[in-house]
């Protein structure tokens, strides 16, 4: 009887450990599967000096009256997910083509402000995520969140973009709550 009881206890203990490992593993891999969005902006007089920021952090400036002139965006952590974006440029309008996966959108050295942006996800996993983004626009401050290709900014109103925040979330998640609206300098 004692041997049977030890076998039962050993079996139950092994079962609990196995379930814990499986459950913890699946939760960890699910949490780790949310990709990282990384981006940098070219700022009037500052260039690319700010460097790359990620996951909703502010890129650019606020309260300094400096225009964004170009942006590069990429997604990391999911080989089946890409990102495309295009900007509305002072006196040029919307770019004809989307830039993608770290390519430059906007201008450098032309003293042209970005006025609006559209961002969308691509790839076989694009249907699993939403991309949210918002901009800090001249005279308006932080605007509301746009997502999945919607326009964020002031196309046609001749207002410069000064800052941007971008994040990728699981499909159907609500817009992020107010992220800190401070720059990353």
Tell what function each PLM region has.
Residues 1-12:
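Bacterial N-terminal signal peptides that target proteins for export
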Residues 19-34:
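Sec-dependent signal peptide cleavage junction
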Residues 32-185:
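Lectin-type carbohydrate-recognition ectodomains
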């Amino acid at each position: 009887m004692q041997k049977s009881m030890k076998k039962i206890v050993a079996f139950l203990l092994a079962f609990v450990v196995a379930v814990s490992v499986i459950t913890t593993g699946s939760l960890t891999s699910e949490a780790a599967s949310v990709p990282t969005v990384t981006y940098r902006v070219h700022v009037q007089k500052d260039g690319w000096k700010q460097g790359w920021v990620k996951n909703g952090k502010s890129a650019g400036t606020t309260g300094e009256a400096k225009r964004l002139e170009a942006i590069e965006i990429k997604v990391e952590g999911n080989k089946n997910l890409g990102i495309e974006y295009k900007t509305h440029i002072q006196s040029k309008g919307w770019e004809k083509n989307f830039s993608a996966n770290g390519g430059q959108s906007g201008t450098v050295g032309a003293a042209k402000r970005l006025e609006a942006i559209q961002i969308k996800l691509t790839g076989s996993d694009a249907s699993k995520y939403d991309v949210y983004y918002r901009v800090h626009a001249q005279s308006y401050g932080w605007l509301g969140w746009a997502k999945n290709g919607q326009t964020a900014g002031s196309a046609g109103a001749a207002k410069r973009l000064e800052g941007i925040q971008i994040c990728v979330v699981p499909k159907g998640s609500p817009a992020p709550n107010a992220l800190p609206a401070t720059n990353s300098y």
